[in-house]
A protein has these predicted regions:
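C-terminal non-catalytic interaction/assembly regions of soluble proteins
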Residues: 1-23, 316-320, 333-549
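N-terminal phosphate-binding or glycine-rich loops at protein starts, especially the Walker A/P-loop
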Residues: 1-18, 63-113
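Helix-enriched interaction subdomains in cytosolic or periplasmic regions
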Residues: 2-50
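Glycine-rich oxoanion-binding loops at beta->alpha junctions
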Residues: 30-63, 112-163, 200, 211-216, ...
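Gly-rich Lys/Arg/Thr-decorated short loops/hinges at beta-loop-alpha junctions or inter-strand turns
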Residues: 65-73, 128-140, 198-210, 235-238, ...
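Short glycine/serine/threonine-rich phosphate/pyrophosphate-binding segments
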Residues: 79-89, 112-113, 145-150, 171-179, ...
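Accessory alpha-helical/coil subdomains and C-terminal extensions
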Residues: 100, 164-169, 175-192, 207-412
Length: 549
């Protein structure tokens, strides 16, 4: 593998560990736990793994353990730091007994089911330390939900002598880890299952999980790009830049990037929903900022838009729900078939309620057509294909044109469009993510050594220096509730949305009027790996505000 100068230098970085993990540990058990919701239902579904205590690791006595093998899976979308979770797990497992082996399942959970794997040796591991990406073993989106998958999994786990399986993933992947842990415990198969919290979207966090790994690096990567655009914007002074940011279920990325770069406008999906804003309300909000800046002679600006915004607008959310219903054949659960596009559009317009039809017809013709026609195999509208940034800029342009005729607007409006998503998913991890991920993996090895299953590896107090971080584990059942998914009630980990009464949003809300009027841009620049700690080791603004005492 040919390497860049940065890769070569970065490989020498030794991630920092919490003090408790720097030697032998003992597991200190807290009180019994309950799920965040639907306690009786979750307890009935997970009788073997429900109610377990929170674990905290402290310095302990050294003990000899017999050799054992561990399996690891990367599940779902990539996030910076995945390789460091594996390197921390590798080093942790080897420190317990040099004869221990680590096996990686190829291309995600599908590798477990299809018996595709590789042994991760020290030579292989050293090629991937402190690098971005999931390419050491690849990732996949196969869901581990069915008994036949679990049974195929146990076949290969037994063949390889694997005692524990570590699943690195987001809320859905860790939900599957919880189900798998319960199944293997119920069957007394003797295989432990441990989860590690991953997602750049930042929606896998709660009182126990301060942040999911990769969020720090991804937001710093996007913020560098946004800062570059803001500087260009303030240099040419003739464009409004509409920037869509990854994050379909929650607006954590948009909020964090706004805190880092201070754009003129940042939309927060959760606020749009809470205020029951219409699409026209959103457009008017942006257009007002454009008009106010134009009145000061500033015909330029930046707008940050969360990827999932359109699904949070109540009227459109209601429309999409009905479209999903009418475009699905109730007999088969599959997408309805039509002779052609026009027949399909006519069917939709005749089938949906009048209020939803009015919303559909208020949209630009091509967007309305897209909502009617683009479906997945189950008949669901493919909302992610809608270019929200272009939709909003076109509607803003139309509103400004109308205001100009009425004498309410005197400026010029020209838009540029950007979507930042994949640019941040495989970036080389920041020092924070390199340390945090390595600690998560090393910590997982200690949960395994202490015989735990159905736990998520957790590192807390991460705004402090790494030596002061707190290592331990949390029962995954503690994060579960029952939600409606694909027409059925299912146990799932509750997604963490932006809290409108939380410190990060409140700080943003206190500043946004000033940022809308003034050109108060901040230019974070690229991620730094060497230099002063205030440049290299800072956590996200979100975490700093949440943890401020």
């Amino acid at each position: 593998m040919e390497k860049s100068a940065l890769q070569i230098a970065r490989a020498a970085y030794q991630p920092k560990l919490p003090k408790a993990l720097q030697g032998p540990v003992k597991a200190v058990e807290g009180a019994a736990t309950q799920s965040v919701g639907n306690q009786e239902e979750i307890k009935a579904l997970f009788p073997n793994t429900y109610g377990m205590p929170v674990i905290t690791f402290e310095a302990g006595e050294a003990q000899e353990l017999p050799a054992f093998n561990v399996g690891v899976i990367l599940s779902g979308g990539q996030a910076p730091g995945g390789h460091n979770v594996i390197s921390g797990l590798f080093d942790g497992v080897k420190s317990l007994n040099p004869a221990n082996k680590l096996y990686g399942f190829i291309l995600g959970p599908g590798g477990l089911v299809d018996h595709k794997y590789m042994e991760i040796t020290s030579e292989i591991m050293d090629e991937y330390r402190n690098t971005g990406g999931f390419d050491i073993i690849g990732s996949g989106r196969t869901k581990l939900e069915k008994e036949d998958q679990f049974e195929k999994g146990i076949e290969i786990l037994r063949e390889l002598g694997i005692k524990a399986l570590v699943i690195i993933g987001g809320d859905d992947s860790n939900t599957n880890a919880c189900v798998l842990a319960e199944y293997y415990a119920a069957k007394k198969y003797g295989v432990q299952v441990i989860g590690c919290p991953k997602t750049i979207d930042g929606d896998l966090k709660n009182e126990q999980i301060e942040t999911s790994f990769g969020f720090d690096t991804a937001c710093k990567t996007y913020s560098e790009l946004i800062g570059n655009i803001e500087r260009d914007c303030n240099s040419a002074r003739k464009y409004w830049h509409f920037i869509k940011l990854m994050g379909r279920s929650a607006s954590h990325i948009a909020l964090e990037c706004a805190l880092q770069t201070q754009p003129n406008v940042c939309l927060i999906s959760e606020e749009v929903e809470a205020k029951e804003m219409s699409l026209d309300d959103v457009v008017t909000y942006i257009a007002t900022a454009v008009a106010n800046r134009a009145a000061d002679g500033n015909n330029f600006g930046t707008v940050l838009i969360p990827e999932g915004l359109i699904e949070f607008i109540p009227a459109i959310k209601k429309l999409i729900a009905e479209l999903n219903e009418v475009l699905t054949d109730p007999a088969t659960g599959e997408s309805r078939e039509f002779a052609g596009a026009e027949e399909q559009i006519a069917f939709v317009k005749g089938a949906i309620a009048k209020d939803n039809l009015a919303v559909l017809e208020s949209l630009p013709a091509d967007v309305a057509r897209q909502l009617c026609l683009d479906r997945d195999p189950h008949g669901n509208v493919q909302v992610s294909l809608i270019e929200t940034e272009k939709l909003l800029s076109r509607m803003v342009a139309d509103k400004l044109a109308a205001w100009k005729k009425e004498g309410k607007y005197v400026g010029k409006f020209s838009a540029q469009h950007h979507f930042f998503g994949y640019e941040g998913r495989c970036a080389a991890p920041s020092n924070y993510d390199a340390d945090y991920c390595y600690s998560l993996g090393f910590n997982a090895s200690r949960l395994i050594a202490n015989g735990k299953t159905g736990y998520m590896s957790v590192i807390k107090n991460t705004t402090a220096p790494a030596a002061e971080w707190i290592a331990g584990g949390v029962p995954i059942t503690m994060m579960m509730n029952i939600e409606r998914r694909n027409g059925a009630n299912k146990p799932v980990i509750r997604k963490a949305l932006v809290e409108l009464d939380g410190a990060p949003f409140k700080f943003f809300a206190s500043k946004r009027e000033q940022w809308a009027k003034e050109t108060a841009y901040v230019y974070p620049g690229p991620i730094q790996y060497w230099g002063p700690s205030e440049v290299c080791d800072q956590t996200t603004k979100t975490l700093q505000l949440e943890q401020a005492k």
